[in-house]
């Protein structure tokens, strides 16, 4: 029997506000344990939450970017549960009226077709703290993360393969990153994914019993965990077994999933409206203000790069991987840079440098006008393509004008025959054995002179001009 795979994803995204959702504590990542906390985060008696408007702004932007309807009257709810990293014994979240609902994004499948993935809801909530279990037998609670604003984006169960889930996550991450509401760095916990997967016989309308997957710390592990579950569940069903509703975690070392707990039924969190926060009215003016702050998104930019700039689908996809890279590219082209040449540099030398340095394009000194100027002085023969790589590294580390650096460092390419011919004659005089080999007709003897000339000019001879002049002067030796 063959089975159809049914996948839905829950994605938690930390919003990059300066302060937390209900307290003035810093929301920045990476501080010492409990450094970013105050009495609200610790839930001291009598303290009250104060709404951070920037969180609602971010929620509106996310809802718009994901083609969602927006609840014009929005409230928060208490989700009741006890855990050491949750000192209030409840989480402030949204239950029946999330900020966004009925959304969708479009993904591109392997065969080139597109598919619309529906998004059920996006709701705002506060993050919980973090428990660490020490080797000394004690458990430690860090509340830096407590109260950091989150938006949870819940898809419908529209994905039919692990590959579709991977593609959906990639597209979702791009869109959220373009809005500017989060850096969506999984390695820092600002994007976290839980997956729900079930199988059903082809032709059956009713969903099978789902399994929830956790500990998915990369998109690659999401795909691997889902692939393992497809095989595990199919094998169990074919052998006459029954799928239990359970939570499993992905074990990267063993490349499989491990049972965490069995779910006997839906958890009863006893939701009720948060009495310490008011109803928030989101009017059209507020929505329009947030819409005006949104950029053009990756899909639209890719179409523009292909249709208007003549780039390949691959190039367009690479250039829109991050908003910063896409903005850099568009600025360079607007300054007169050739789209294909700018694209080649960004995907070639620039990408290699960023990978080697572990940096993003915003973190280096290269600017779009620097890059355009460097491409221009390659085109006019001031420097060679080989020398340009050295110039680029200087610009990436120090910034400044490409032409000014080339002139100051003495890197200007030598193209004047009046300068090169005497150097060629000196090369002949300094390499009599090579001249003798050439005159005797020894095979490939002429090729050695190119290296001698480049060495004599410290690599500054224009390769094309140098080859032409060498051929002329060698012909004179033969004559």
UniProtKB/Swiss-Prot annotation:
GO molecular function: asparaginyl-tRNA synthase (glutamine-hydrolyzing) activity; ATP binding; glutaminyl-tRNA synthase (glutamine-hydrolyzing) activity
Top-level taxon of the source organism: Bacteria
Catalysed transformations (reactions): L-glutamyl-tRNA(Gln) + L-glutamine + ATP + H2O = L-glutaminyl-tRNA(Gln) + L-glutamate + ADP + phosphate + H(+); L-aspartyl-tRNA(Asn) + L-glutamine + ATP + H2O = L-asparaginyl-tRNA(Asn) + L-glutamate + ADP + phosphate + 2 H(+)
Keywords: ATP-binding, Ligase, Nucleotide-binding, Protein biosynthesis
Pfam family, one: GatB_N
Enzyme Commission number(s) from the entry: 6.3.5.-
Database matches in InterPro entries: Asn/Gln-tRNA_amidoTrfase_suB/E, Asn/Gln-tRNA_Trfase_suB/E_cat, Asn/Gln_amidotransferase, Asn/Gln_tRNA_amidoTrase-B-like, GatB, GatB_C_1, GatB_Yqey_C_2, Gln-tRNA_amidoTrfase_suB_CS
Gene Ontology terms describing biological process: glutaminyl-tRNAGln biosynthesis via transamidation; translation
Record function comment: Allows the formation of correctly charged Asn-tRNA(Asn) or Gln-tRNA(Gln) through the transamidation of misacylated Asp-tRNA(Asn) or Glu-tRNA(Gln) in organisms which lack either or both of asparaginyl-tRNA or glutaminyl-tRNA synthetases. The reaction takes place in the presence of glutamine and ATP through an activated phospho-Asp-tRNA(Asn) or phospho-Glu-tRNA(Gln).
NCBIfam families per the UniProt record, alphabetical: gatB, PRK05477.1-1, PRK05477.1-2, PRK05477.1-4
Quaternary organization: Heterotrimer of A, B and C subunits.
Protein name per its UniProtKB record: Aspartyl/glutamyl-tRNA(Asn/Gln) amidotransferase subunit B
């Amino acid at each position: 029997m063959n089975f159809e795979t049914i996948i839905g994803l829950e994605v938690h995204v930390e919003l990059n506000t300066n302060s937390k959702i209900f307290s003035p504590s810093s929301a920045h990542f990476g501080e010492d344990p409990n450094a970013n906390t105050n009495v609200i985060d610790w839930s001291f008696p009598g303290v009250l939450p104060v709404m951070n408007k920037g969180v609602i702004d971010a929620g509106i932007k996310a809802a718009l970017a994901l083609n969602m309807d927006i609840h014009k009257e929005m409230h928060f709810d208490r989700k009741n549960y006890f855990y050491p990293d949750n000192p209030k014994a409840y989480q402030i979240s949204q239950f029946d009226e999330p900020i966004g609902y009925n959304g969708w994004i479009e993904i591109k499948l392997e065969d080139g077709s597109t598919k619309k993935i529906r998004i059920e809801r996006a709701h705002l909530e506060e993050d919980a703290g973090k428990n660490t279990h020490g080797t000394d037998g004690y458990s430690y609670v860090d509340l830096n993360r407590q109260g950091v604003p989150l938006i949870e984006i819940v898809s419908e169960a529209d994905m039919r393969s692990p590959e579709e889930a991977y593609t959906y996550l990639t597209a979702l991450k791009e869109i959220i990153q373009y809005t500017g509401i989060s850096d969506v760095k999984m390695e820092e916990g600002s994007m976290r994914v839980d997956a729900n997967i079930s199988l059903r016989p082809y032709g059956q309308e009713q969903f099978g019993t789902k399994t929830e997957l956790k500990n998915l710390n990369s998109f690659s592990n999401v795909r691997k965990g889902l692939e393992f579950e497809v095989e595990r569940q199919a094998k169990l069903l074919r052998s006459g077994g029954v799928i239990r509703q359970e939570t499993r975690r992905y074990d990267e070392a063993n490349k499989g999933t491990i049972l965490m707990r069995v779910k006997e039924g839906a958890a009863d969190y006893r939701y009720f409206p948060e009495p310490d926060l008011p109803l928030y009215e989101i009017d059209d003016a507020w929505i329009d203000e947030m819409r005006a702050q949104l950029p053009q998104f990756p899909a639209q930019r890719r179409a523009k790069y292909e249709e208007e700039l003549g780039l390949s689908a691959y190039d367009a996809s690479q250039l829109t991987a991050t908003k910063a890279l896409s903005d850099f590219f568009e600025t360079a082209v607007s300054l007169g840079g050739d789209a294909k040449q700018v694209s080649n540099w960004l995907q070639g030398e620039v990408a290699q440098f960023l990978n080697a340095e572990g940096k993003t394009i915003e973190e280096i000194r290269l600017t779009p006008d620097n890059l355009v100027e460097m491409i221009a002085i390659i085109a006019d023969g001031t420097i060679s393509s080989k020398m340009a790589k050295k110039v680029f590294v200087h610009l990436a580390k120090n910034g400044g004008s490409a032409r000014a650096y080339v002139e100051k460092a003495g890197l200007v390419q030598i193209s004047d025959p009046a300068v090169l011919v005497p150097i060629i004659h000196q090369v002949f005089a300094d390499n009599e054995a090579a001249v003798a080999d050439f005159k005797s007709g020894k095979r490939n003897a002429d090729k050695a002179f190119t290296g001698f000339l480049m060495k004599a000019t410290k690599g500054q001879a224009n390769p094309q001009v140098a080859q032409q002049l060498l051929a002329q002067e060698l012909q004179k030796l033969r004559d």
